Amino acid sequence: MREESWEEHDTIQLTAQRKYLAEVQALETLLARELSVFLTEPGSKKTNIINRITGKTYALPSTELLRLYEHLEQCRKQGALMYFLERQGTYSGLMLDYDLKLNTNAAPSLESSVLSRLCHRIFVHIKNSSVLPEGSHKIHFFFTLKPEAVQGKYGFHVLIPGLKMAASTKKSIIASLQHDATVQKILHEQGVANPESCLDPHSASVPSLLYGSSKLNHKPYQLKTGFELVFDSSDPDYIPIHQIKNIESYNLVSELSLTNEQGSLVRPVYCAADIAAEKEEEIPADDHSLSILMLHDPEARYLHKILNLLPPEYYVEYPLWSNVVFALANTSANYRPLAEWFSQKCPEKWNTGGKEKLEKLWNDASHHTEKKITKRSIMYWAHKHAPQQYKEIVEQGYFSILAEYVYSYNGTLEHYMIAKVIYAMMGNKFVVDVDSNGKYVWFEFVLPGQPMNQGEIWKWRKEVNPDELHIYISENFSRVMDRITEHIKYHLSQPHETNILNYYKKLLKAFERSKSKIFNDSFKKGVIRQAEFLFRQRSFIQTLDTNPHLLGVGNGVLSIETIPAKLINHFHEHPIHQYTHICYVPFNPENPWTKLLLNALQDIIPELDARLWIMFYLSTAIFRGLKEALMLLWLGGGCNGKTFLMRLVAMVLGDHYASKLNISLLTSYRETAEKPNSAFMRLKGRGYGYFEETNKSEVLNTSRLKEMVNPGDVTARELNQKQESFQMTATMVAASNYNFIIDTTDHGTWRRLRHYRSKVKFCHNPDPNNSYEKKEDPRFIHEYIMDPNCQNAFFSILVYFWEKLQKEYNGQIKKVFCPTIESETEAYRKSQDTLHRFITERVVESPSAETVYNLSEVVTAYAEWYNANINVKRHIALELSQELENSVLEKYLQWSPNKTRILKGCRILHKFETLQPGESYIGVSSTGTLLNTPICEPKNKWWEWSPNPSAPPEKEASAPTP
């Protein structure tokens, strides 16, 4: 059988002894039924008995103490594990705790002659304390020893239970003993390396273990011997001492108790005390909280071992330490004792404000949802630094949980028990949540080496049925069960009493029946159903893919939150489910595919400023958060590359992040609230959406247009689904061979639109004299767009422009200087919006103008201009007034004292009238060209140039206007 640690022995033995030891059953009955009336609140000064197993405390009267001692003595003789302490109070026997560091790994012999010498020296200090009463008294000394030395450490206790003295007296005696040269010499002769510091000064007041009890996960100290010393105050120099005979015939739990006053062997001797100097020691409410937590929580025991694998930098360096604390806090609020224990591994930091820092950090953890790391990270760190030890601990953890069930339920295992162990095994790899239809849905974290689709690695994959768990139960779980069989057979081979051997025989028989069930399909389905409740992580589905700066890519997860972008191709705790199959590789302009695409972009969009602006705009498709309210309308007569570019963006991002949209979304009337709209739902969670191939003269629905472009929440639903609310996060492009008709004068709509007209045409036989005709290459449409190398290269280009946009323009498209698109947008608006055309041709900004126009005067001027230049029609003054208030003149309109709207700071030109000094057209010149210097192509590396009106690039020869 594999060697089991004492910790594992504790947890298994505690469960088993309740089954086959009548003495343990009787003790538990006594505590639960008869002594429960004496329970106290943790920390109460009335407490005299502490049960470490349950954490319960008692204030037992002397008669009940004797009953408890009797039961504990019977359990001790049967070898039962016990964890009882007595509180010393203000007046009790003396306990000396020696913690030895040895020169070797072997325990010192501590023969009776050595212990007798120690008795004499200890009594000298007691006598010198002047607290012994007059008369003749028998004083008993007991020595209990640690069962074995562990890594050069050893210990023993000296118990003088009958000598009742105050805590202050004990402290005085201990203080003088610490400097006793004779005691130090005796210990040094026994191979003790720290004789001057091995006596624990706190042993005067801390709770003391009752004999036969132990600290959790430690073996109990064993009685080596006892001495009886006779002291007579009339002859203080004559102190006979002899070894106690037949010591095992007494109730040793009772006799060695520091507070018992009714022993058969040990009779109390009451020492003098300075009552005024006494202060009753307090028992903290969380005393031994880590030990109790580890006893009752198998996962806490498991994490305790895992944390021990982390190297020192994890508790010395603040960033790593804070991550461990956050991980524990996010895993369970009950794991605070683990965090304290781990923090104390660095005494220097703990003793200089460490507790206060931990307190603050622990409280912060519940509020910092963006730092949602859990025990999964602790597992990863431990495996990274100590893979072999990690594997051994993990396997032993499964064994302990299963063993506890086997021993608790006499070898019979049911669905939930197996599911509990499976959860311990696979809880870091699988998660269950309930979807919007009320169904339990499984998610698996996909790791390298397992079957997967391209792009699923390092992400949470949705599973219809967790087939890996089904296989795992039959193939891997059986190995853990074999260890249980091995463990039971080991105990059957030991020289136990008949009743204990019979217990193990029945246990093995029942367990063998349970083992065969894990190969049964129906039984495994039952286990999986129970596992759903254990693996359930509420709201997990709602947290998936909510970070707009994270994209699932073919080779991991790409974070664009920092510049440069970071590829996460290892363990992480980001809840990512969606992905594109494209692998991220850093931008490299020397890559042949990247060169090909950069040259193609130069051909498709010949104007440098427009090319850069469009690439900046398209790069925002990789970000799925709220964006600037913009939509690009791309006009082109065909064979100009716009469709190739838009489709390439969509193919690179994949269906999870991009969608081709039905043009009817922009052109049809909005559906009523109760009707579904699957086309609109295609925008949910997408970073990119595009329209293409419209009919001639399509009229856009401006209310739908504003809804789709504006950042913020919208509502819609799929067929047969509930109404959903989601944010519009898509970068929108609408391409057409014909201009869209936008029948609105609303400036709020127009300022969200950008318009670009393609100039280039790709032909089979291009005109060599026309620089806007290029040689067509069918491979772009039929081969390149489908090639993974091409797609990977284009994705790197998008990421490059995203990073450039963040670094140079703070992520804001509107800051990118682009006179080409601005002038074309202005011209397009004027062709659609006659009111805007009137304003840009006839209304000028005139700061020195004294004339103030009533809004009705502006309405009249527009109506006259419209009838003269467009068409004669009847105008409705109220409608025109409202349109003017929503136009670009909005910022020039003010309220007059009589509460009417006036136009101030502007002048309305008459036909053929020119500008006066200091005046300027509102935004554009009379010919529709922006009042900025046009820019031209730089000689090299166009993608590196940053559009800036104050620093135009080095010019080449201007291209002719098509």
From Swiss-Prot:
Question: Is Nucleotide-binding set as a keyword in this record?
Answer: yes
- The EC number of this protein is 3.6.4.-
Could you list this entry's UniProt keywords, alphabetically sorted: ATP-binding, DNA replication, Helicase, Hydrolase, Late protein, Nucleotide-binding
Which positions bind ATP?
G636, G637, G638, C639, N640, G641, K642, T643
The UniProt induction remark is: Expressed in the late phase of the viral replicative cycle.
Q: Name one GO molecular function term.
A: ATP binding
An example Pfam family from this entry, by short name, is: PriCT_2
Q: What is this protein called?
A: Putative primase C962R
Question: What organism, scientifically named, is this protein from?
Answer: African swine fever virus (isolate Pig/Kenya/KEN-50/1950) (ASFV)
